[in-house]
């Protein structure tokens, strides 16, 4: 075992055999997606989508103090709260030209099941869904100079995000670790694979206070001590200014989409382009 942990280790035959058997219990449960819509004034049959997952893990591996409740305060109560705040913002601004859909999906942590179910059984046709934005876990470390776009370069929605970011003095940047496949690990993927252009970004890795070093330290601390663990709880010391900055971008992107007659598509050659073209052609 010690040798296997060393660089350059190569597998060796153990000349052993093993026989295993195990039992599995299957629990069937029902959970709900929650959807709200603000009807558009000029093109009510065209839809702009906001998504966030409201579920988390429930009980999980207990912490040292015995707490075994995974509350999911950051992941994803922050996104769910943002969804409600955006709906309130749209209501205060007045109905846009296109309809705005606010979708809180369940069972993301169980394999994107809620968004998958909606995408396959949509309340509003995906062929008439212009595009959307997904929100999954906001950074509570304060405002950033940049924003990290997951899947940057995939669709024409980047243009809307770039315009929104410019108005806030921020710079969209490509995710530093695309090999981790984050674009395929949250609810926007359920819609993307059926053709709907979706944008997803994170708060940024260059904080206004502390720069990249502070951002990395905060991210590592969250992943080590709170991510999918009982420690992901509300903290009165949270810095909400970064959340508000990100929320403005989500609002601007959705509002711009809802106030235009343009139909942004996946960029030429993208894996989801063909299914979108087929959906829009009605074939």
Roles of regions detected by a PLM:
Residues 27-29, 47, 73-80, 108-111, ...:
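Solvent-exposed, acidic/flexible segments
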């Amino acid at each position: 075992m010690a040798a296997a942990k060393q660089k350059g280790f190569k597998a060796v035959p153990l000349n052993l055999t093993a026989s295993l058997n195990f039992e599995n219990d299957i629990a069937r449960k029902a959970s709900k997606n929650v959807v709200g819509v603000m009807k558009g004034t000029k093109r009510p049959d065209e839809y702009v989508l906001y998504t966030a997952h409201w579920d988390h893990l429930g009980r999980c591996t207990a912490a040292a103090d015995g707490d075994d409740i995974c509350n999911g305060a950051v992941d994803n109560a922050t996104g769910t709260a943002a969804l409600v705040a955006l709906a309130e913002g749209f209501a205060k601004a007045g109905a846009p030209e296109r309809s705005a859909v606010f979708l809180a999906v369940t069972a993301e942590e169980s394999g994107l099941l809620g968004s998958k179910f909606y995408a396959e059984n949509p309340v509003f046709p995906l062929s008439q869904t212009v595009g959307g934005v997904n929100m999954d876990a906001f950074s509570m470390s304060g405002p950033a100079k940049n924003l990290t776009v997951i899947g940057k370069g995939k669709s024409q929605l980047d243009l809307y995000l770039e315009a929104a970011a410019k108005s806030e003095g921020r710079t969209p940047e490509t995710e530093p670790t695309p090999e981790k496949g984050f674009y395929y690990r949250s609810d926007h993927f359920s819609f993307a694979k059926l053709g709907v252009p979706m944008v997803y970004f994170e708060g940024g890795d260059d904080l206004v206070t502390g720069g990249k070093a502070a951002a990395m330290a905060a991210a590592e601390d969250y992943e080590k001590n709170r991510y999918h663990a009982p420690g992901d709880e509300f903290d009165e010391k949270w810095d909400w200014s970064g959340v508000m900055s990100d929320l403005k971008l989500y609002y601007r992107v959705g509002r711009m989409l809802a106030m235009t007659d343009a139909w942004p598509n996946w960029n030429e050659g993208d894996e989801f382009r063909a299914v979108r073209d087929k959906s829009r052609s009605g074939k």
